[in-house]
Amino acid sequence: MKFLDEAKVYIRSGDGGNGCVAFRREKFIEFGGPNGGNGGRGGDIIVEAADGLNTLIDYRYQQHFKAQKGGNGMGSDRHGAGGKDIVMKVPVGTQIFDEDKETLIHDFTKVGERFVLAKGGNGGFGNAHFKSSTNRAPRHANPGLPGEERWIWLRLKLIADAGLVGLPNAGKSTFLSKVSAAKPKIADYPFTTLHPQLGVVNSDGREFVLADIPGLIEGAHEGAGLGDRFLGHIERCRVLLHLIDATCEHAGKAYKTVRGELEAYAETLVDKIEIVALNKIDAVEPDELKKQKDRLKRAAKKTPLLLSGVTGQGVPEALRALVAVIGEAPVSDKAIGTADNPAEAKPWAPQDA
């Protein structure tokens, strides 16, 4: 299934039904009195976080959602039926932004969570409602109130146990395909991965979700390369596996480049638990491998793991290291700045498609 992590959607809740002007008409009853019913309430637009979804692709093909209007009131004190609600299903991790692309409306963090995005209009009162001691036969009724309408942005931030980060061509997709059933596109050129990929990994009977995040380059937080569009996905990963290409010019500089982009986007990203690994060790000579390992160790201030996504060497050890820390890592299910005050959320500007 094609991955889509942003969509612009138009929503409109249902209008309320009109109240009715009617009078009781019955044999031998000369003054039956008013009996016009009230209009029904319009349908709501509700967004629900559903299990089993991991993309917003459905909202590329259907972008307009209009709830049903409430039924009109009728005579004999019959009230109009309420309009049918529309429930929009989204993956866990979806955020709703206003049309200005900055105001965060809601953040879905658990399955089954619901949010009423637009309430239906109230139904109008029928003339029976206005009957009083001084007005025994009111001849007016209220129209229903209009529903709410607006454009919104949906943005998905994947929730994964671990995330793969690194420069383009660091071997992230190869690693993911080696340890899971995911089939990401793999090629010998930068930016092969254009969308995040998810895979379920099994290590010694323990399962966890691993996300392959498209490669970052220097200046990504300012829009370079694929920009910071996918940096948001890293926010919700509990642990990061940072892969560095052993065949690159300087492993230490490559490591610092990615760390600098993470810190520039949000300081909380650099506080996440990180496992550093030198990848593609099968493609370099032993002497060069030792130099790269030492450079990376000095830059990261920790001893890196050595692995090869192609041959599988060192991969089981990397998975065990991930499993060991995933259980201890905090769950980052809230977007930066949204836990207490949504107004302080970091602005996000979707790319106009």
From Swiss-Prot:
Residues annotated to bind GTP: 166-173, 191-195, 212-215, 279-282, 308-310
Q: Per the annotation, which location comes first and is thus the protein's main one?
A: cytoplasm
Q: Which GO terms describe its biological process?
A: ribosome biogenesis
Q: Which residues bind Mg(2+)?
A: 173, 193
Q: Tell me its EC number(s), please.
A: 3.6.5.-
Q: Which PROSITE patterns match?
A: G_OBG, GTP1_OBG, OBG
Key word Metal-binding present: yes
Give the GO cellular component terms, alphabetically. cytoplasm
Q: Which UniProt keywords apply?
A: Cytoplasm, GTP-binding, Hydrolase, Magnesium, Metal-binding, Nucleotide-binding
Query: Which InterPro entries does the entry mention?
Result: G_OBG (IPR031167), GTP-bd (IPR006073), GTP-bd_Obg/CgtA (IPR014100), GTP1-OBG_CS (IPR006074), GTP1_OBG_dom (IPR006169), GTP1_OBG_dom_sf (IPR036726), OBG_GTPase (IPR045086), P-loop_NTPase (IPR027417)
Superkingdom field: Bacteria
| Localization per Swiss-Prot or TrEMBL | Cytoplasm
Cofactor(s) demanded = Mg(2+)
- The chain positions of domain Obg read 1-159
| Keyword Cytoplasm appears in the UniProt entry | yes
List GO molecular-function terms, semicolon-separated. GTP binding; GTPase activity; magnesium ion binding
Q: Which residues form the OBG-type G domain?
A: 160-327
Q: How does it assemble?
A: Monomer.
- PANTHER family this protein is in? DEVELOPMENTALLY REGULATED GTP-BINDING PROTEIN-RELATED, MITOCHONDRIAL RIBOSOME-ASSOCIATED GTPASE 2
Q: Extract the NCBIfam families matched here.
A: Obg_CgtA, PRK12297.1, PRK12299.1
Q: What is the stated purpose of this protein? A: An essential GTPase which binds GTP, GDP and possibly (p)ppGpp with moderate affinity, with high nucleotide exchange rates and a fairly low GTP hydrolysis rate. Plays a role in control of the cell cycle, stress response, ribosome biogenesis and in those bacteria that undergo differentiation, in morphogenesis control.
- Member of which family? Belongs to the TRAFAC class OBG-HflX-like GTPase superfamily. OBG GTPase family.
In Swiss-Prot or TrEMBL terms, this protein is called GTPase Obg
Organism of this sequence: Rhodopseudomonas palustris (strain ATCC BAA-98 / CGA009)
